[in-house]
Amino acid sequence: MIGPGTGIAPFRAFLQERQATGAQGPNWLFFGEQRADSDFYYKDELSQMVKNGLLTRLDTAFSRDQDHKIYVQQRMLENTGQVWDWLQNGAHVYVCGDAKRMAKDVDNALRKICQTAGNLSDDQTEEYMAALRRDKRYQRDVY
């Protein structure tokens, strides 16, 4: 799940649904915003979800908390091998948020992960990405 800013909304609902139904299986949320102290939506709730095991992993990117900007796609690339392993094990990728830049940058990061960790050529990467979309394992709600 990749949901910076208000893009986190459906993923909070996903997690609440998992909690209500007792769903099992690993899940990973990438969340980003400008500042951790003022923009970390649902911080306490998400932290509790990690603590109780409902949310397997939470990676954050706060773009204005340091001299250089950090975004969710960079966090994905920092975890290239693990993201690739999750994909190989059947993970679904859901993206929600900004269509202008974030969605494109996340898409490019996924392609780079396929090429780097998966050793896929450009053509193989296109085929892999198309298969993810066809199998409904890569879905985007961007605006």
Language-model features: where?
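Active-site beta-strand/loop microenvironment that shapes enzyme catalytic pockets
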Residues: 1-17
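Reductase modules of NAD(P)H-dependent flavoproteins
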Residues: 19, 24-143
